[in-house]
Amino acid sequence: MPKVWTDDTALMEGMTDNLFEALYKMPKYFLRIDDIAHSLGMPISSLLVLCVLREGKISIGEISERLCIAKPNVTPLVETLCARGLISRQRSDKDRRKVLVGLMPEGEAMVERIRGAIRDQMMSWPRDYNLSEMKRVNNALAATLEVAD
């Protein structure tokens, strides 16, 4: 039987330790998403919906799956964001039973505000990080996101 990555005890222990540390270090040193959400006057879950929709129109079920939020909890988020004029809902041309959710121009502007808030936070990172370290962080993030897709 072929060996799977979970059979590698050292790898599993290392990843467990790294993910454990990331739980508290990522928000402290890199991205304080709660501060961003508060500054924009929306809950974190609504902010995350907007971030997911940046990739294009998707169904409520796909939003639920990507954010690991139960479908019944996604619907009120979508309704609230629709009421704010940030997103819209429309029936799929391919499957009339499916409702697609997408960004409105105001939602696209809000996504840019989120990106700007992230840039602002990056500007407040300690100046003693050097260019080489920041390139390593960026490459590690890119590799992690590539694997996650």
Regions found by a protein language model. Give the residues of each.
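N-terminal leader segment of winged-helix/HTH proteins
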Residues: 1-40, 132
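Secondary-structure edge/capping motif, primarily at the C-terminal ends of alpha-helices
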Residues: 4-5, 60, 148
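C-terminal ligand-sensing/allosteric alpha-helical core of TetR-family HTH transcriptional regulators
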Residues: 15-33, 106, 117, 121, ...
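N-terminal helix-turn-helix DNA-binding core of bacterial DNA-binding proteins
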Residues: 31-73
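Charged, amphipathic alpha-helical coiled-coil/dimerization segments
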Residues: 79-142
